[in-house]
Amino acid sequence: MQDEGPTSRVPRLISGELRESSYLCTQITPTTFMLINEIFYSLQGEGVHMGKASIFIRLSRCNLRCSFCDTEFDSGTEMTIEELRDAIAPYPGRRIIWTGGEPTLQLTEETVAYFKALGYHQSIETNGTRRPPAGLDYITCSPKKEAMQLLHRNFPDGVGEFRFPVGSPADLPPAVSELPPAGAYLLSPIFVGETQSEADKAAIELCVSHILEHPEWQLSLQMHKLIHIP
């Protein structure tokens, strides 16, 4: 029988509610709307898929507060899944990156299935404190101290890449043997300045030195900040 097309396979999302989580922050149960911080179309700026055209869907809310983060956590626009679908439809790229904030606070298995049925490849950028929903094509985990003891529980099958932001020796990662399996283990020197767009020479030197001593790691520069794109 001939396929009726992707739209016919889009599952209906169930309604949900906002409630308090027992761990770290507010979480959202499956719902027909999401709080969106911003949507933009650009190149993936770092990591294994650097340089690929991607639709960035930045979700509001986070359960951590990191000094180097470039996101305003709490503001955003409430959008239905259908409005979100229509907002990204004009972009020719078919790669979605769910980022934040901490996207696992809002992203559900139902939402992932919805966009998968529309033919999108979906990645997530997470801090590792919560298990991502099933169905994602790629997981980037940038673990924070609060998540280190949770990584094996939250990622029993491993991740696509671990990416550790590094600004000082205290930020250097544990041994690879202590982490779940990953396709790549990356060190990302932080950027500084008022707009966090200036390379930190000391952080770069620290990363390079660590990688030379531990060659299972590799360097991941934030290319989008170097060439000044979103």
Predicted regions and their residues:
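Intrinsically disordered, low-complexity regions
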Residues: M1-P6, E17-L18, T26, V48, ...
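Flexible, acidic/Gly-rich N-terminal and inter-domain linker regions that tether
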Residues: D3, V10-F56, S60, R65-F68, ...
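Intrinsic-disorder/low-complexity coil detector
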Residues: G5-V10, T29, A89-Y91, R131-P132, ...
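A ubiquitous, low-specificity "background" feature that marks scattered single residues
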Residues: R9, Y23-T29, G76, T108, ...
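Broad hydrophobic/π-residue packing in well-ordered secondary structure
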Residues: M34, F40, H49, F56-R58, ...
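Conserved Radical SAM active-site core
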Residues: N37-Y41, A53-F56, N63-L136
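Conserved AdoMet/S-adenosylmethionine-binding subsite of the radical SAM
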Residues: T104-P230
